[in-house]
Curated annotation (Swiss-Prot):
It comes from Xenorhabdus nematophila (strain ATCC 19061 / DSM 3370 / CCUG 14189 / LMG 1036 / NCIMB 9965 / AN6). Residues 119-141 have a biased composition (Acidic residues). Pfam families: RraB (PF06877). SUPFAM superfamilies: Hypothetical protein VC0424 (SSF89946). GO terms for cellular component: cytoplasm. This is Regulator of ribonuclease activity B. Globally modulates RNA abundance by binding to RNase E (Rne) and regulating its endonucleolytic activity. Can modulate Rne action in a substrate-dependent manner by altering the composition of the degradosome. Interacts with the C-terminal region of Rne. Belongs to the RraB family.
Amino acid sequence: MADPHVLEEQFEETRSIIEELLEDGSDPDATYIIEHHFSAEDFDQLEKAAVEAFKLGYEVTDAEELETEDRVILMCCDVISESRLEVDLINAQVKQLADLAEKMGVNYDGWGTYFEDPNAPDDEDDNDDLFPPEEDEPRLH
């Protein structure tokens, strides 16, 4: 189980992110892509955590290498869901994934999302994919 103090910090961060997005005019009725961030020094640990997150119903990105300011090499991936911008829904994901990260020996580094313009035209070609086409795939728009 994740440290309760760390969870409370993450819950406060969730409230802050949502509040800032809505204050900036992001669409309160949109479905958002929520990117939870995992990292680890050991690729195998990260991979095992990613597999477990996938089993829980999340999409998972490929691992990428990141060098910290202290020159430590970390392997990172995003654990992705779609959700309304609601504190309780996102905090339930935060708790689930922070607990998983603790169990698997990886870091849960919070979450992020993107601004959703309420005035943007609906994309009729949208096929509800979480990920855009690969660079070598033809674009439909």
